[in-house]
C-alpha cells in the first residue's frame, strides 16, 4: 500500500518538474522574441556566452523610448526602438574591447592602465565612458579625447 502512495507521489513530482522546465523554456523564448532582431544580433556578437533574462521598455529617459536588456552575467544593454545600442554597462568584467573604438581603448590603456571601461554610451557629441575608478570621460565620434567629467 505504501509503495503505491510513493509511486503516485513521485509521478506527481515528475510531472510538476517537467511542467516547470517547460515554463522556464517558454519564458526564455518569449524574452528573446521581445528584442528586435538587430539587438539580438548585437548581443550574440558581443556577448556570445550570455543569455537574456529580462527585457524592459523604458520611456522615462530624455532620449525617448528604449529597450533595456539584462543578461545573465549582469550586463545591461540599452537599445533604441530601431535596435541600435545606446549604452552598455558591465561592472564586473568591463565592456568587451571589441565594442570600444580603438582610439578610446588606446587612451584608456595609456592613461588608466589599471582600470576597465564599465560603461560605454553613445551620445550626440560622440561617446562617454565610465571607468572602474568611477571617472567619466568624453570622446568625439572618432574616439578622440574631449574631457574628463567630474
Region spans (language model):
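Bacterial N-terminal signal peptides that target proteins for export
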Residues: 7-18
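C-terminal motif of bacterial Sec signal peptides marking the signal peptidase cleavage site
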Residues: 28-29
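Short, non-transmembrane alpha-helical segments in secretory-pathway proteins
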Residues: 32-52, 95-116
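A cross-family detector of function-defining hotspots
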Residues: 53-71, 116-132
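Amphipathic N-proximal alpha-helical interface segments
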Residues: 65-90, 132-150
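Extracytoplasmic electrostatic interaction patches
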Residues: 96-150
